[in-house]
């Protein structure tokens, strides 16, 4: 039955919705005592389809839909990591890299995927800095850059605190941005930084006393 249902769709977004609860069954079982080996077979069959279809499903989405997918990607990443299947993990990592590099993916998704790849140590600081430089380029719309930051900084701002080269890129971007653009993105920046723990915010505030006073 599970396998029949899984073959009914190749929609990556629907597959992502299904993944976390199925992995939960593999870890803990359920009250229906579902056959976990059958669940594992289904999961191992549809994750490659998810990876193949992910980028195409996310092309040219608006901000509202992209934010919904952002949460799905974070959940799917956690679920795939729990499985401990190296081949599936490699396929997923490749899909994340495709998301980062595709020009028509929304900035919040590109930022989130960059962050995940950094945390997996698939992007080192240099590779991450390259993506950050591109996202925070003065040639880009300031709102798009701030939205990329929202995705990149999801969960924690510690990577900025512990990686001075990344902090420097943020510093330079805010220092160079015009006053009118800065005022426009203040709500986005506040929303992003408000999600950090009090200790993180205090540390970053100490580092940021200068940079949030643009010229």
Question: Which role does the model predict for each range below?
Answer:
Residues 1-215:
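Extended repeat-based interaction scaffolds and adjacent low-complexity, acidic/S/T/P-biased segments
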